[in-house]
């Protein structure tokens, strides 16, 4: 803060973490959203059907999903505990994990201990993330900490209900698809909440709200251009 004239953060919480608790109250701070491409992350019934078929997900299966690194930040072992509670309530649930990381061996061992090996899919690193997002019936993000997770916006863009921990900042929660629970809540509460919100999943288009909040890529680019013009004395 000694040398900068203007400050940007991907969210208010991220800005406070980097620049200080009261940075968002200053006139020289703005949020530059982690925007995503609406042309890629949108409801796509064909991609949903194809991806589910490719990974052996039947019409009667219910698919919970996660996209990200399997590391301490993302709290994957807790995610597995949540899924185990969900699976105990409904045998049709499966879990698909997109991504890898240092905790993958522990995740595989946890799935085996709970007898869930045939219901947990480790998909590894994938390039077509929108197709997987569309395949999900529920997106899980029980992180220990986050800045402003782009995956939460991507899931909303695809119309997927989301259940995140209260450790995840609510900056990107701009639709009624996102729900939060504390990590201290009982696993049965997590399972019940997952069941409730997944039951009302619609895979509808929510881009009007996301764009208005600044999370559509072209909208975000225009806002950034306007900010540069203003700071450069051209506006």
Language-model features and meaning:
Residues 125, 144:
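Aromatic "clamp/platform" in nucleotide-sugar-dependent glycosyltransferases that forms part
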Residues 53-54, 58-62, 76-121, 233-235:
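A conserved nucleotide-sugar
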Residues 42-57:
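A short helix/loop element that forms part of the nucleotide-sugar donor recognition site in Leloir-type
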Residues 202-235:
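A charged, aromatic-enriched C-terminal amphipathic alpha-helix characteristic of glycosyltransferases
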Residues 2-42:
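A short, active-site helix/loop in glycosyltransferases that binds the activated sugar's phosphate group
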Residues 161-165, 170:
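Short hydrophobic beta-strand element within catalytic cores of glycosyltransferases
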């Amino acid at each position: 803060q000694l040398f900068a004239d203007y400050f940007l953060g991907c969210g208010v919480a991220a800005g406070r973490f980097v620049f200080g608790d009261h940075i968002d109250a200053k006139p020289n701070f703005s949020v530059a959203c982690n925007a995503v491409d609406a042309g890629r992350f949108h409801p796509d019934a064909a991609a949903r059907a194809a991806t589910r078929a490719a990974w052996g997900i039947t019409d009667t299966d219910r698919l919970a999903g996660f996209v990200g690194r399997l590391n301490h930040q993302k709290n994957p072992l807790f995610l597995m505990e949540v899924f185990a509670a969900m699976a105990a309530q409904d045998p049709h649930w499966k879990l698909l994990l997109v991504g890898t990381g240092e905790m993958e061996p522990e995740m595989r061992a946890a799935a085996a201990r709970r007898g869930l090996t045939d219901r947990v899919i480790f998909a590894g690193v994938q390039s077509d993330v929108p197709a997987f997002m569309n395949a999900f019936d529920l997106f899980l993000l029980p992180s220990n900490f986050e800045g402003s997770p782009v995956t939460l916006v991507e899931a909303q863009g695809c119309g997927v209900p989301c259940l995140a921990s209260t450790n995840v900042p609510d900056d990107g929660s701009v639709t009624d698809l996102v729900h939060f629970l504390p990590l201290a809540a009982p696993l049965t509460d997590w399972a019940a909440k997952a069941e409730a919100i997944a039951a009302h999943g619609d895979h509808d288009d929510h881009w009007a709200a996301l764009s208005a909040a600044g999370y559509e890529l072209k909208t975000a680019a225009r806002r950034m251009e306007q900010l540069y013009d203003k700071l450069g004395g051209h506006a």
